[in-house]
């Protein structure tokens, strides 16, 4: 599918931000789909490019872009999964190999790589920005009508797995965002009590 985003605002011009109540409706209903339920069709190349363009608009203190994207299309993802499976089985770890179903089954994935740089902007803030990229990418995919899930598993942290993905020593996987069409609508899960988690500060 070809997706046409609204024109990107021109640098230095005012950005009109009218209310979008439909966004509140979306957030009220937002629910991740289990990765193992995601099937074809998934986002095509034009849609993936648009999703990444949207995700790159997250808050980014210092304008450092302390993240990058690795697209795992069906061919690339299958090859990556095969190498991970060989790695796990070579270690005698069938449990780790079994966990690859979440990577194998969805049609497409995008790895969000945190690449924090030495800067006066604290490392924590740069990593938070990478997390915001994951969230925005997840939401944008769902707003486009796909199911999506933010996954981290052993292959997000394992040194050899990260090397297979092409990460530099200082880079970390903030998350794999897997996308596709859910076989069934996801069921609502229990949500936290936001009132109990909120306090009003007073001096």
Language model region names:
Residues 108, 144, 173-175:
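Generic beta-strand structural signal
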Residues 1-105, 203:
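N-terminal amphipathic, basic helical "cap/leader" segment at the start of enzyme domains
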Residues 55, 110, 116-164:
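Small-aliphatic-rich amphipathic alpha-helix that forms the alpha element of a beta-alpha
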Residues 26, 102, 109-111, 176-178, ...:
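Conserved hydrophobic/aromatic beta-strand scaffold that supports enzyme active sites
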Residues 187-203:
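Phosphate/diphosphate-binding glycine-rich loops and adjacent basic-rich segments that engage nucleotide
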Residues 74-79, 85-86, 116-118, 159, ...:
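Short, charged/polar surface micro-motifs in flexible loops or helix N-caps
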Residues 100-102, 165-190:
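A glycine-rich helix N-cap at a beta->alpha junction
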């Amino acid at each position: 599918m070809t997706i046409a985003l609204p024109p990107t605002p021109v640098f230095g011009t005012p950005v009109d931000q009218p209310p979008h109540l439909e966004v509140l409706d979306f957030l009220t209903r937002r629910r991740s789909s289990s990765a193992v339920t995601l099937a074809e069709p998934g986002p095509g190349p034009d849609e993936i490019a648009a999703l990444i363009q949207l995700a790159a608009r997250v808050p980014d203190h210092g304008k450092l872009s302390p993240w990058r994207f690795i697209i795992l299309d069906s061919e690339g993802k299958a090859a990556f999964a095969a190498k991970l499976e060989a790695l796990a089985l070579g270690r005698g770890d069938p449990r780790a190999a079994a966990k690859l179903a979440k990577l194998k089954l969805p049609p497409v994935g995008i790895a969000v790589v945190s690449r924090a740089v030495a800067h006066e902007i604290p490392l924590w803030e740069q990593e938070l920005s990478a997390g915001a990229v994951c969230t925005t990418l997840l939401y944008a995919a769902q707003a486009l009508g796909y199911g999506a899930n933010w996954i981290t598993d052993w292959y997000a942290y394992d040194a050899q797995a990260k090397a297979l993905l092409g990460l530099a020593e200082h880079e970390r996987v903030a998350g794999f965002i897997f996308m596709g069409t859910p076989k069934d609508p996801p069921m609502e899960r229990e949500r936290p009590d936001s009132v109990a988690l909120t306090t009003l500060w007073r001096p």
